Amino acid sequence: MATHEEFIRTQVFGTVFEITNRYTDLNPVGMGAFGLVCSATDTLVGQPVAIKKIMKPFSTAVLAKRTYRELKLLKHLRHENLICLQDIFLSPLEDIYFVTELQGTDLHRLLQTRPLEKQFVQYFLYQILRGLKYVHSAGVIHRDLKPSNILINENCDLKICDFGLARIQDPQMTGYVSTRYYRAPEIMLTWQKYDVEVDIWSAGCIFSEMIEGKPLFPGKDHVHQFSIITDLLGSPPRDVINTICSENTLKFVTSLPHRDPVPFQERFKTVEPDAVDLLRRMLVFVPKKRITAADALVHPYLAPYHDPTDEPTAEAQFDWDFNDADLPVDTWRVMMYSEILDFHKIGGGDGQIDTNAAFDDQVAAAHAAAMAQHHHQTQQQSSGKHTNPTTSSSAATITVTVPIAITMPSLIMVIKRFTT
C-alpha cells in the first residue's frame, strides 16, 4: 500500500536538511567532507536511523561518480558487520539522502572514553575481520578503515561504514586516501600498487589501538609516519623497495640508515602471546605476506568467536565496469535514478514493507525526464541546456541481526551515553 509523504525543510549546522515526514526528531551526529549525518526516528517502523545527506551530488562529474559508487556498494554489500542501506531518496533540491541503521557510537569515540577489556578487543576485532572477509571476497577494498568508520551499538554489535572511497581490487591504483595513522606503507611508498592487504594493515593498527588505548603509528607527517613504522618493523625489505615508482621516494628510503626490527614480544610485553602473534602477522611490510581476513578469523586469538559456518563470503563479485568511465554529470544522474528506482522496486533487499507505489511513479518520471535530457544533450552537446528533475519517495526497510552477543554493563553504559 502506497503512502503519501511530504518533504520538510530544516536547518542543521547551517545546512538545509530536506527529508520526508516519515523521519522526525532530527539531530546532527557528524559532518564529513562529502555530507552531514543526522540521527532521526523512522515513524513507519518506530526505530532510530541515521540519515546522511550527500550535498549537491550532481554539481560535478567527480562527485556524481563518487555518490553513484557509494550507492552501488551499499546496495551490493549486505552483511551483518557492514552498515545496511534502509532507504534512499532525492529531495526537491536534488540532494541525495542515505538512510541506515543508527549505531550508538563509533570506535574512535569509545576509545577516547576508556580502555577496552580483553574480551571486547577480541570481539570487536573478530567482527572487523568478519566484515573484511566478506568485503574482500566481493572484490572490494575499503581503503579508509579507521576507528571513526567502525560503528558500535549498545549490544556491542559492530558495523563498518563509509564505503565512499572503496575501490576495485586493481593492482594499479592512484593516490592514497586512508587517514595517516592507519595508512599501509605501500600506499606511502608506491601510491599505485596496492590491494586488499591495505585493509589488513589498517585493521592491525586498530587492533593495537584497542589494546593500548592510543594509536600505534601517530605520524605527524608523511616522513614521520614512515619513520615510526620502521622503528618497529625495521627497514623495508628489498622486494618492497623494488616496487617504489617515484624517484624522489626511492632516494628518500634508500638514504635512511638501516634499522633492525623490534620483536613484537618485546614491544608488547604485557599483551597475551596469541594477540601479539596475530598483530605481528597483520603488520608486515610485504603486503602479500600479511595474513588474510579469512585466515585471521581462524587464528587461536579469535577462537572464542570463530564459527566457520557463520563467516560468509559474497555471493557475487561487485561489478566495477562503471569505475573507469569518464561520463558527464547528466549521465551519472540517469544511472543514479535507475539505481534508486531499482532499490525501491526490490523493497530495499527484502520487500518487508510495500510502500513503493508512489515512489515508483515519481522516480520513474524523473528517470524518464533525465533519460530524455541525456538523449537531447548527446544529440545537441553544444546547446549547454540543463534541467533539474525533482522527486520524492516512499521507502522500504530491512532488518539485520547479529547472532553473537556479549555484554558488560560498564561498557554498555558508556555506549548508551552517546545515544542520549
Curated annotation (Swiss-Prot):
Main location as per UniProt: cytoplasm
Subcellular localization(s) per the UniProt record: Cytoplasm; Nucleus
Cofactor (UniProt): Mg(2+)
Keywords in alphabetical order: Activator, ATP-binding, Cytoplasm, Kinase, Nucleotide-binding, Nucleus, Phosphoprotein, Serine/threonine-protein kinase, Transcription, Transcription regulation, Transferase
Motif TXY: positions: 174-176
Phosphotyrosine modified-residue sites: 176
Entry binding sites for ATP: 29-37, 52
Active site (UniProt): 144 (proton acceptor)
One GO MF term attached to the UniProt entry: MAP kinase activity
UniProt modified residues of type Phosphothreonine: 174
Keyword Transcription regulation: yes
Domain of life the protein comes from: Eukaryota
Entry's Gene Ontology cellular component terms: cytoplasm; nucleus
Coiled coil: none
Region called Disordered, residue ranges: 372-394
SUPFAM superfamilies given in the database record: Protein kinase-like (PK-like)
A GO BP entry: stress-activated MAPK cascade
EC number assigned by the record: 2.7.11.24
Gene3D superfamilies: Phosphorylase Kinase, domain 1 (3.30.200.20), Transferase(Phosphotransferase) domain 1 (1.10.510.10)
Domains as described in the record: The TXY motif contains the threonine and tyrosine residues whose phosphorylation activates the MAP kinases.
Summary of the function given for this chain in its UniProt record: Mitogen-activated protein kinase involved in a signal transduction pathway that is activated by changes in the osmolarity of the extracellular environment. Controls osmotic regulation of transcription of target genes.
The family this protein is said to belong to: Belongs to the protein kinase superfamily. Ser/Thr protein kinase family. MAP kinase subfamily. HOG1 sub-subfamily.
Protein name: Mitogen-activated protein kinase HOG2
Originating species: Zygosaccharomyces rouxii
